[in-house]
Amino acid sequence: HAGAKVAITQDLRWQRCHIKSTALLGNVMHFQQGYREGNAETILFNGDGQITEASSSNVFIVKDGEVLTPPLDNQLLPGITRMLVLACLQKAGIPHRESWFSVDDLNNADEVWLTSSGKEILPVVQVGDKTIADGKVGPVWEQAFTLYSKLKFEL
């Protein structure tokens, strides 16, 4: 996989993002804004500059070999793929934790991924105008994707 380019914008949706409902217009609007600009997805941050999720995905970063994803709360939807990826990381002993991280942390990450049922684990190589690390898919993503692919066939 060559990796994806994504947009980033402040999350202007209501503050009950953990409730999956039919009121997903805000998500669609964020996605369409990024898509019109040639992006695969749009990563969202809150008023404090912390990454929450993407318009239809959960967000992960890797820094110094450790995988981070925002903790579950009312600002993000608890994705099924997110849960499965965390289980794969745990089983394989890959360092990971649920922790808030900033836009700067995202921009300076070694790797960025998005997870969703449709995207599975999508490596991101560019966020806005910022290239992530060397602009190539990283080794921790490769390992996580292999583990996730095996898990899918075990279920």
Where do the protein language model's features map onto the residues?
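Helix-start/capping segments and mature chain N-termini
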Residues: 1-155
